[in-house]
Amino acid sequence: MKAVAVGTLALALTCLAVPAFAQASNDYCQGKSLTLVVGSPPAGGYDTYGRLVAEHLGHFIPGGCSIVVQNMPGAGSLRAANFLFQQGPSDGLTIGMIQPNLALDQAFNSENVKYDLRKFQWIGRIATAVETTVAWQSSPVKTIQDAKTHEITLAAATANGLTAGFPRVMNAIVGTKFKIISGYGGTAAIVLAMERGEVEGGHMGGHSLLSEKQDWVTGNKVSVLVQYSQTRDPGLSSVPAMVEFAQTPEQKKILSLFAATTEIGRTLVAPPGVASDRVAALRAAFAAMANAAEFRADVEKRKLELNVLSGEALEQMINSSLDISPSLAKVAEKAWTGQK
């Protein structure tokens, strides 16, 4: 995915100019350590990005500081989000990396939600987490329009996860006929099921598809039916984003909520009470890190995706996505869970 990552980065960095005022002052971190709370267990994808940031970000915070990763898994980052929101120190020495599914938990008014994403202070996004649905070459389904007239079996990991949730949303809102078969352990099992002909299609992460299974796309082994995003990823520019299938403003609002979860991606946040000048310093440090040649080289070495977005742009996206009426949020929740 080398060409994709570099091209995406070039587009994104135009928005990440480093504010001079933040560079010139605010050395609150000097001689101290900053804690990065990662709402995922060690060795996973979010942990990998968290440790990448921990190695580089401190060099760009005025005064310089070391960064210590603290893993706080639980309920898809809900535990970490609640901690940061309710107990996160306001001194700018604790930040977090939490999973984007938290937007759905908040929109669905889940009982364990103690946070409000709109009150977090967003530092920046490192990478998206765009997901796709693909159909194997033997399937008559080549487009979403085909999937509205022909039933197609899709492999999914669990009944409650995103590999089943996104296709269910397409069924409920767009009118596709995805028959979801859950119980496959993860991406590797889904890939094997398609190759063996057990199912006609499945759910794939966009980065996995382009980096590990690029021959599927270039060799026409699969048709990529949809990417679950608000805008088309540069690496999947010919694949429609899910919001493009909205026929009404209500449908667009619902689909935008789901699409935002992948666009939020791997992001850094600060607790609500951190002073504005320290938030500005963290945002400037993030922008400087994203522009740094050594950081980009490390990303390429690790074969990771890089699609950065400023904290200000993230804040706007989240506020817009969560600006949804209770009645539409209920429709969205039923679509996600498969309720009638």
What is each residue range found by the language model?
Residues 18-22:
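Sec/Tat signal peptide C-region and signal peptidase I cleavage site
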Residues 35-50, 73-76, 155-162:
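Extracytoplasmic "Venus flytrap"
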